[in-house]
């Protein structure tokens, strides 16, 4: 029997990308799903498809940057299912702009609110229920949560913050049976980059990543599901990601150079489009 059979699972950022695909994978394994995002029409679309796999699904339209909305997610889940077994903090937004070019620094505050505080708020309200169920907490971060990347200052800061928070929380929860799994994807074929915030604070409307460097969302989600099921401490995707972790310790300047060249290469790719 699947580890997710009748597992009450909350997925934030479930209307597209990794969150959407994860909803389908867990629905197929018998999970009872609570899907949340801001766009109600997209949530309904995802929920309808998830139900075709026989899953029980409820949706909650919410902005995870708001504490009250996160409390609503948890309260709705408890009212519907009576418990929480897994919390997947997946909601996020990104950026493509050098810090010196940013017109209004408040855009970084919004990124931090969504990516970091959204995870903190949801975890705060869900934690008593997760302790009761000896459940799972999952933070979907990014390889930019492990290294610095130019043009991603605000995004990298938010993902580094997620890592610090969840790594610390894991230690606090070690004796109560709640696992904390951190996920570090590289570039994945989702819409997050096309909706990235540019220097002017508006969506950039272009994906600057060479398609040859992108992992499919299906492959990414397969890895995530296995990591959640195994209650792994962390899952660093791609060979480059794993190598980067070690190089950062022994040759941080090399990693800085690799990150710089990668961004410059992506810029040349955009110029050819």
Which residues does each PLM region occupy?
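Conserved glycine-rich cofactor-binding loop
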Residues: 8, 15-17
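Conserved glycine-rich Rossmann-like NAD(P)H-binding loop of the short-chain dehydrogenase/reductase
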Residues: 29-46
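The beta1-alpha1 cofactor-binding region of Rossmann-like NAD(H)/NADP(H)-dependent oxidoreductases
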Residues: 40, 61-72, 105
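Conserved mid-core segment of classical short-chain dehydrogenase/reductases
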Residues: 94-109, 151-154
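Active-site helix of classical SDR
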Residues: 123, 158
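Residue(s) in the substrate-gating loop at a strand-loop-helix junction
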Residues: 142
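SDR active-site lid
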Residues: 175-239
């Amino acid at each position: 029997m699947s580890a997710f059979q009748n597992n009450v699972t909350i997925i934030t950022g479930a209307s597209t990308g990794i969150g959407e695909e994860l909803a389908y994978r867990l629905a197929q394994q018998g999970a009872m799903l609570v899907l949340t995002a801001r766009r109600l029409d997209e949530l309904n679309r995802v929920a309808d498809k998830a139900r075709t796999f026989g899953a029980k699904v409820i949706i909650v339209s919410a902005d995870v940057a708001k504490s009250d909305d996160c409390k609503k997610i948890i309260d709705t889940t408890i009212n519907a299912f009576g418990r929480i077994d897994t919390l997947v903090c997946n909601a996020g937004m990104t950026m493509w702009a050098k810090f010196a070019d940013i017109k209004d620094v408040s855009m970084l505050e919004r990124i931090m609110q969504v990516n970091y505080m959204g995870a903190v708020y949801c975890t705060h309200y869900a934690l008593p229920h997760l302790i009761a169920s000896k459940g799972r907490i999952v933070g979907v971060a990014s390889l930019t949560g492990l290294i610095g990347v130019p043009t991603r200052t605000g995004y990298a800061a938010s993902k580094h913050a997620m890592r610090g928070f969840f790594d610390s929380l894991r230690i606090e929860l070690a004796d109560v049976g709640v696992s904390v799994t951190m996920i570090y994807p590289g570039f994945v074929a989702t819409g997050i980059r096309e909706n990235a915030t540019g220097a002017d604070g508006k969506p950039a409307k272009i994906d600057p990543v060479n398609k040859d460097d992108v992992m499919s969302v299906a492959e990414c989600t397969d890895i995530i599901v296995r990591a959640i099921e195994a209650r792994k401490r962390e899952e660093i995707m791609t060979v480059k990601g794993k190598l980067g972790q070690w190089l950062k310790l022994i040759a941080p300047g090399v990693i800085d150079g690799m990150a710089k060249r990668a961004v410059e290469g992506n810029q040349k790719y955009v110029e050819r489009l």
